[in-house]
A protein has these predicted regions:
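Helix-to-loop junctions at the C-terminal end of transmembrane segments
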Residues: 150-164
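C-terminal transmembrane helical hairpin of 12-TM major facilitator-type secondary transporters
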Residues: 165-208
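Short amphipathic helix-loop junctions that connect adjacent transmembrane helices
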Residues: 119-136
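Helix-loop-helix hairpin linking two adjacent transmembrane segments in secondary transporters
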Residues: 23-66
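Multi-pass alpha-helical transporter architecture, strongest
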Residues: 61-67, 265-294
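Short, small-residue-biased leader/transition segments that mark boundaries at the very start
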Residues: 1-6
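A membrane-interface helix-boundary motif in multi-pass transporters
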Residues: 42-55, 245-270
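Juxtamembrane intracellular "pre-TM" segments in multi-pass secondary transporters
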Residues: 69-105, 128, 294
Length: 294
């Protein structure tokens, strides 16, 4: 999150969204390469991957401390406030920004929806389409690789052509459609076009991040990213029980309706709610601007 904050401070309005996309792509690449390296090093002992991870973290610390320039100028820094040095204090303070408050809520709903993939994708494809574990693994690799391409290449193109707001709306619609197809498709070949819609729909997250960052003062970027990090962590506690329990119920004998796609229907509805909140946030912001102008 300090990385995201620094990225915003060194970005301009023209390249902010592109830079957020690069950071997201970097995280995605790490999630692909990391397990490969860890699995390879594990052959030399169970402690080896952790030792190498510690060395890489130390190298990263040295680079950040000695070579990465401070992005927040001294005259823009504010005094430390213990009341705001926690997620709830930060969120309370962020409420004074009308655009931010509703966007944060929008991000919570879509984050819960996104966790449906990691929670039940393997269970769903094996249950409904009898996929092998290898095919599940290939599909997850497909998601990871294509996500990197989208964040590295497509985000910057769409940001220039559509702008952040329209790009976010497009992302919400594509993701919602992808989830809906997962839920109801009777054909497994349709899963891959649906995956494509879901992955490209990830552009909404990058666009919303850029919008929120551009609406905040420089000396409060770190607080915004920290609060968002805490809330996104909270969604990882909510989503897995919600998605797995609904899947278990509607694929079990106790349910009169057999519907393994129920988690993705829930995800589609949550994404629709996120889209509505996103659009509502701009209406609120526009009304506030008009009232101030009067």
């Amino acid at each position: 999150f300090p990385t995201r904050r620094s990225s915003d401070l060194i970005s301009t309005d023209d390249n902010r969204t592109k830079n957020f996309g690069l950071i997201n792509a970097g995280f995605g690449l790490g999630f692909i390469i990391g397990p490969i390296i860890g699995g390879t090093l594990g052959q030399f002992g169970t402690h080896t991957p952790f030792i190498v991870a510690a060395i890489l973290s130390f190298i990263n610390f040295i680079f950040g401390y000695y070579f990465f320039p401070e992005s927040l100028k001294a005259n823009n820094r504010r005094k430390f406030d213990r009341k705001r040095a926690n997620p709830f204090g930060s969120l309370k303070h962020l409420q004074k920004f009308p655009l931010i408050k509703t966007l944060v809520l929008s991000m919570i709903f879509v984050s819960i929806a996104n966790h449906s993939m990691e929670s039940v994708w393997a269970f769903f494809t094996i249950e409904k389409f009898k996929w092998s574990t290898s095919l599940v693994g290939y599909s997850l690799a497909f998601i990871g690789i294509l996500s990197i391409i989208v964040q590295l290449w497509l985000v910057s193109i769409l940001a220039k052509k559509l702008g952040d707001k329209r790009m976010a709306v497009l992302g919400f619609v594509l993701m919602m459609t992808g989830f809906f197809l997962f839920a109801f498709t009777p054909w497994q070949w349709l899963l891959f076009p649906a995956l494509l819609l879901f992955i490209v729909g990830g552009i909404q997250g990058t666009a919303v991040q850029s919008i929120m960052s551009s609406a905040m003062p420089d000396n409060e970027q770190g607080e915004l990213q920290g609060a968002l990090g805490s809330l996104m962590g909270l969604t990882t506690l909510i989503a897995p029980p919600l998605m797995t329990s609904s899947f278990s119920y509607f694929t079990g004998k106790q349910s009169e309706i057999y519907f393994p796609g129920i988690p993705f229907l829930i995800a589609s509805i949550l994404t629709l709610i996120s889209l509505i909140l996103f659009l509502k946030s701009f209406k609120k912001s526009n009304r506030l601007i008009k009232s101030v102008d009067k």
